[in-house]
Amino acid sequence: MQRKQRETTEMKKALIALTAFLSIAAHADTPAPSDDSDLPEWAEKQIGPFHATMTDWVDGTSRSIDGFFGTTDALTVDSDSYLRISQELAWKEGEEFDQDLGVRFRLDLPTTEERLRLIIESEPDETRGTLDEQESSLADDRGNSIEDVLVGLRHLGEGDRTREWDTELGAGIKVRLPLDPYARLSTQRLWTLNDGPWKLHSDNRFSWFNEDGFSARTRWDLGRLVDEKRHLRFISNAQWREEVDTLEFRQVAELNQRVNSRSVLRYSAAVLGEGLSHATIEDSYLQLRFRRDIHKGFTFLDVAPALHFPRDVDREPRWALTLRVEMYFRRFIDRVTL
């Protein structure tokens, strides 16, 4: 009885959140008074100085380190350094709400040597777990532990990925005790099929960590613009990790729709599975994701209701809802894209 009451309470919370989402989406194309923020004036006054101070610190720190190891060009060259702070709330039918406070940073030092960069980053792709765990997070990447900080060198590829494979080599250490050395090889390629609207992008990585062993992952992304506001994509992912010794795969079809300059919608249908000779579909789901730039291009809201059909409950439908707020500290960033 108590479990049933708890599930009913959780469902009510999810419905309230979903109602709020539908309300936001319904008014997403209505111009706001300030046109670049949905926050009240008092919140803007609190966030503005804090964001400016943190952004200056991130940018200044990366350029100071880069100038020490590199050249005076560090004061003017573009840098991919950033800090992201996020708060995520996830709910699945039959389970309690799961809260996750995440911090991810990346210090990109572009002038250390020609085509050689010193990279300091938290939570690389190799530490993000299974494809199912990656799917459960709305972020393209997530970082939760200071133990997974990498310090390494990356040799940039010289190729034009539209004409040939662009290859990058990297090596370094994971900052933890005992120190965990790593090496990785990445390749990328972009094709325009028959000079038409379809583009195929391939992104591959082969890695070795002393503690976790070898891993390999590949991503193939076939997409095209449908019109000025819609983009269609078919994405295939596969990964293998020595520590679990199984092949995981995911196939996604998604339609991205730009509502306006600050809002996008994504409609997705996906299947996730594992195994090679005896492959099994572990889950399939339908998801609607709404992403909104709620404040001046550096604070974003994501709301994503989904309907899952997991194998472990005989494909019975299970609702899920994820809410996420994230703030970026970086000079230039555009995270509301198709």
Q: Which stretches of residues belong to each language-model region?
A:
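Long, compositionally biased, intrinsically disordered segments
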Residues: 103, 107, 187-189, 222, ...
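Residues that cap or initiate secondary-structure elements
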Residues: 91-93, 124, 161, 175, ...
